Amino acid sequence: MNKLLTIVIPTYNMQDYLHRCLDSLLLPDKQMEQLEVMVVNDGSKDNSSIIAHEYEPKHPKTFRVIDKENGNYGSCINRGLKEAAGKYIKILDADDWFDTAEFSRYMEELQHIDADMILTNHQVVDDAGNLTSKYSYNIEPNKLFAFQEYKESGVYFAMHSITYRTQMLREIKYRQTEGISYTDTEWVFYPQHGVQSCIYLPFDVYRYVIGREGQTMDAKVLLKSVSHYDKLLRAMVDFANHLSTEDKALYTYQRIEAQIAHLSMGVYRTCLVLQDADNYDKELIKAFDDFMKNERPQVYKEAGQLTLKKYLPIHYVRYWRITGKRFSVDWIRDTYRRIRYGK
């Protein structure tokens, strides 16, 4: 490896955002020599590839574009990790960007660091760049810790804050699930059983965009992507099941299980409440429910206690399990009318 840091940018139909993203990575010449920017074009149908290739002749020692067939988010991470030349590796989504000044300071400090995982701050912004919220860590900065101390602290690590040592990921044979979105959860949790050392550098590097229409976190997209969460959760359960007894004793395992429970409740709610009553995925939710009953009985039990609202304590998952039908709020309205008006 002859680079200090590799930035992997999974890219699919991002022509409207890619210039902003890539321009934010333009650093002073000396730092550019230490940086590898790898744009993994995931079969984009717009001008994303053309835009990305514009940077190669201008910065041939830094920018590199990989054009490949569509395989979704995880396939881009896997390809980037396979070919990364940096001692460290970080993910940047193509519709997000870095604060260039903070990134430059981070690169300067990174030269003097030797750790399996580095944490930095990030900010959540809207598509116009307006600040929504800031995220930092209540951890002593600029001090190398044994990662076990972080695990025991209960701190949650966001994908946007994490940089990993590339060799560590390769040694644990890290591989992200392909063919689906939302696998950034894997990037946060899976490598942690291989991390021995960690340091927190309080630079506000990452700008994470929330609210852009069409992004994977858009509510309309989420409603159509429940099958991705189904596959992700099955992969997470399989990963957790195969951890060693020693790894299962660590706080990381508890966080994985908590995330499995949290995301599972989202699948139930999406299928049984949010999706259109006439078009929800009946086969998927039945298979998912059976899977959770067998693999995670406690999650299955907790799902049965889910209610629509605090003021409407209807256990909609339990109702569906008993009747095979989704609970309809219309039923409450009709019952009220019959009682109140005799209709």
Label every PLM stretch briefly.
Residues K68-A84:
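Glycine-rich, basic loop-to-helix element that forms the pyrophosphate-binding segment
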Residues I89:
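Short aromatic/hydrophobic "clamp" motif used to bind/position activated sugar donors
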Residues A115, L272-K343:
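Membrane-interface aromatic/basic loop that binds lipid-linked glycans or pyrophosphate carriers
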Residues D23-Q34:
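Short, acidic, metal-binding catalytic loop of nucleotide-sugar glycosyltransferases
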Residues Y73, I77, A94-P202, Y206-K224:
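Donor-binding/catalytic cores of nucleotide-activated saccharide
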Residues L4-T6, E36, E186:
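Cell-envelope/extracellular polymer assembly enzymes that use nucleotide-activated donors
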Residues S24, N41-I50, N70:
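A conserved acidic beta->alpha catalytic loop
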Residues E33-G43, R64-E69, A94:
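Short beta-strand/loop segment that forms part of the nucleotide-sugar
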